[in-house]
Amino acid sequence: LRLNRRDEIGSLVHAFGAMARRLKILEERNLDASPLTGLPGNLAIEREIENRLTAKKTFSLCHVDLDNFKPFVDMYGYAWVSEVIKEVARLLLAQMKTAEAPEDFLGHIGGDDFVIISAPLRAERICREIVAGFDGRIRKFYAAQDRERGFFIGKDRQGNQQKFPLITVTIAIITDDGARFGTPLDMAEAAAPLKEYAKTLPG
């Protein structure tokens, strides 16, 4: 009986310890959360990547970025842009929930940049669904005339008027099991050229 009691106490201690660790992580995420989207911010993202690399288990890091975003900001203003960012966050969250994988992670780097961490096959599926659903969610934020034309007229960096395409989304995916990359920065640096290349592709 004494042994059983000890086992029960040991199990409770372990359970409370695990609960305390989870609460600490949640607290850190809340403190670091984006005020706009409520998603975990840069510190939580960095910690999540570090944990995955340390675990030596294969995962995919997906960097989500919006194209033609700066001209949209200049044309429509920051208040309206904030609504677009929140809508993008809702789209990403919806696809993450559809995947039904609580171990997956979604973070907001800031501005129009987001991060998804998931298992490789699931990450690819999530990203495909995000791309497929993106246009339908974003077009409503344009004026009817711009929506119908498929572009809007704004000013470039030199102040010249020109046509700008509607916002699209680019997602760069990097996969590792801790063998190639040692730090979150290593992964981010590897994702950057992939993202820039993807932005040059049509569609």
Write out the residue ranges for each language-model feature:
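A short glycine-enriched loop-to-beta-strand structural element that forms part of the catalytic core
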Residues: H108, Y142-P193
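Conserved long alpha-helical elements within nucleotide-processing catalytic cores of c-di-GMP signaling
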Residues: G41-S60, K70-K97, G107-G111, V115, ...
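Two-component transmitter module helix at the DHp-CA junction of histidine kinases
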Residues: K24-E28, K97, D135, R139-D146
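Polar/charged heptad-repeat coiled-coil helices used as signal-transmission/dimerization stalks
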Residues: H14-E28, A132
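HAMP signal relay modules and closely related sensory coiled-coil linkers
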Residues: L1-M19
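Nucleotide second-messenger and two-component phosphorelay signaling modules
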Residues: I49-S60, V64, M75, A94-F105, ...
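Amphipathic HAMP/coiled-coil signal-transducing linker helices
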Residues: L23-N42, D74, Y78
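Flexible, glycine/charge-rich interdomain/linker segments that couple
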Residues: G178, Y197-G203
